Amino acid sequence: MLNLREYRARPAALADHLKWACLIAPGIVLNKDGSLQRTIAYRGPDLESSTPEELVAVTARVNNLLSRFGSGWALHIEADRRPSVTYPESTWRDPAAWLVDEERRAAFEEHGRHFETDCYLTLTWMPPADRTARIEQLFIDDPADAPAAFWTEHLAHFETETSRARDMMADLMPEARFLDDDETLTYLHACISVTRQTVRAPSLPMCLDALLVDTPLTGGLSPRLGEETLKILTINGFPAAGEPGILSELDQLGFAYRWVTRFLPLDKPEAEKTLNAYMRNWFAKRRSLTSYLREILTNEPATLLNTDADNQAADADEALQSLGAGHVAFGYCTTAIVVRHADASVAEDQIRAVERVIRGRGFTCVSESVNAVEAWLGTLPGEAYANVRQPLLNTINLAHMAPLSALWAGPERNTHLEGPPLLMARSASSTPFRLVTHQGDVGHMMVLGPTGAGKSVLLSLLALQFRRYAGAQVFIFDKGGSARCATLALGGTWYELGLDGDLAFQPFRDLGSEAGMAEAQAWVLGLVAQESVTVTPEVKQAVWTALQSLGAAPVTQRTLTGLVALVQSSELRQALEPYTLAGPYGALLDADEDSLATGDVLCFEMDALMQDKRLAPPVLAHLFSKLEARFNGRPTMLILDEAWLFLDHPMFAGRLRDWLKTLRKKNVSVVFATQSLSDISSSSIAPSLIESAPTRIFLANARAEEPSQQATYEAFGLNARQIELIARATPKRDYYVQCPDGNRLFDLDLGPVALAFCAAGSKADQKLISEILAASGPDGFAPAWLEARGLHWAADLIGTQGDVPCAAE
């Protein structure tokens, strides 16, 4: 099919050089030369978070995968570095949250273009000739086999082998999947076009070479693809020793490129034949013909040998031994990096940056000129003939230098909430990071780290950014007023739980239903048990009878004082009396109305409450019940700051364990934050915490590598390299996220507006917040606060929500 002489004397268009003919099965392309190809999209392990031992283990498993293939196969391993998605758009209901997000958008775009890397493995197989298959059938007689066309057998064999390869990749990589028809055509189109777009497979997917080409290729010493100049760098020399991810520094570059490593494996006999030829040639070069003649004439052994030839022969012999033992396979490897740009000088600068990285790792390379078009064609998936480099390479060296790993950028969308990521962050490289709280339908998260490392700032930012989701509500249990400013800026309500606060509860308001009665009884029994009253069946009956009588009263009379008047037992009356208006706690628990606001953002200050061990359990038990009634399927974030307060009490620990197991069904994400990892590891519910919170964010901790703390980090599944990253991170700037999808060290990159709202936890800030709140009221708090912090431009913008595209303007 490659012979075009019937139509034209020589190839005249880009389509003539392409091999892709048609789609014959899902994701499988039949090429013009009869070969089959299939592409796997994968995401390799994160080298930044891997220990040397883990890297060696991954290399060994990749070597096992690569050594499965023999003659007739071609492997194209590609890292496609592309521009990252733009900053996500959202519809905001809160001016302060909108302004913070616009500030973050401006900072994100100011840092220049961001890039991320997609990795692909294209497997190409050339079936044996039909006459070979016919000869095989002469020696194999299987009456159970129905006669079938050779091409169906070849297709079935190809599908089986590629599926096995995909399964092996899925075992050692976070993600590995076959491309479907549309994704395959989109990928092939991106290789030969300057325009990135989605390509839909036609109903009759034939003539793919003509279908996919929309950009002309101009040859010459400096070829052009459309209006963009192509620059190709080919590796032609290798260092003496390798290591896993030896070229991973290419993943840090701030421009787009295609890095393609093509491997043409050889069968064992063919590889042995080639290596034997190498060894014989080098062995013969150890001594010249003159030295042989001198040795014969003088009968004395030659003393001068070509040491380099001797070493090369020994190297070839060692390669033969590795091949014979089945440790490795050999093949021909071609590695090329392709960059393109409309400005030829920019393309030249980019290829020089690539060359500096490659030469810095001990490789030699050449910037293609005469061979540029041939080298570019050799990078196209399925092309096994163009630009073949002759030196043999074993599969371990291939695993070291191929693009088998990439920085994890995070998912582009929160699929569970059907929206954008929670927040965009940056890292040391040009690859951005997208934080998504959900793993499947589980949005629980743990935030762990020492005091003063930026925990409260992160929690406040999470609350602000979570408001990007439609119908989102945020409930915060705070300590020290850290989230007070963010809550008020969102138009929420901040409560100080305690006797001096402005919040009062009416626990028996909902006695009109059976559920309300049962809940009230459980609350009262917990109260009397705390007062050292033994809960017997008689006590339960007495409480139930009193509650039934109280339920018949008007709603405003369903108070704790009313319950005490209806209880017949003097012991129960004495136990309940401290919580009525006649006792010290009545102002908080014996109200005739419930003053808890119905807003979407509520914050409860726990500092004063938790100092009273007698008051905290009944107050929090009732408050938890009130909040659970609001968990109605809307996206909800429940933030528990300083969570050791909850772990310290059996009732709270049990409630937290139940929440982690059940609230995901109500679309609630529990964010559990604490300063001490030991509090969690020593808690009775530690297994539930670790299992139910798949996403964990660790704060910078310079003492993380100390033996006592290292053991605690290891209990959370961190390895030595990850602990080292946490120890080297900068407090209040760097955060390390760990989740099943990947790991990443990221920087929130907060601007002055975000810092004004999120970093306002000092006593001076609390005093200023109270003064501004008293002067401007809740509705005017956000602009007044920004004015007080000297951000006059931001205060002016906060009233123009939706009218300007970017806060920086």
Predicted features along the sequence, with ranges:
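Extended, folded cores of ATP/NTP-driven motor/assembly subunits in large transport
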Residues: M1-A409
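P-loop NTPase motor domains
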Residues: P45, P52-R68, K273, A277, ...
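The conserved Walker
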Residues: Q439, T451
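Hydrophobic anchor at the beta1->P-loop junction of P-loop NTPases
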Residues: V447
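Walker A/P-loop NTP-binding active-site region of P-loop NTPases
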Residues: A453-Q506
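A short helix-turn-beta junction within AAA+ P-loop NTPase domains corresponding to the substrate/partner-engaging
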Residues: G492-Y495, I685-L699
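Conserved P-loop NTPase catalytic core
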Residues: L511-E514, E691-A715
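Conserved P-loop NTPase
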Residues: F716-I772
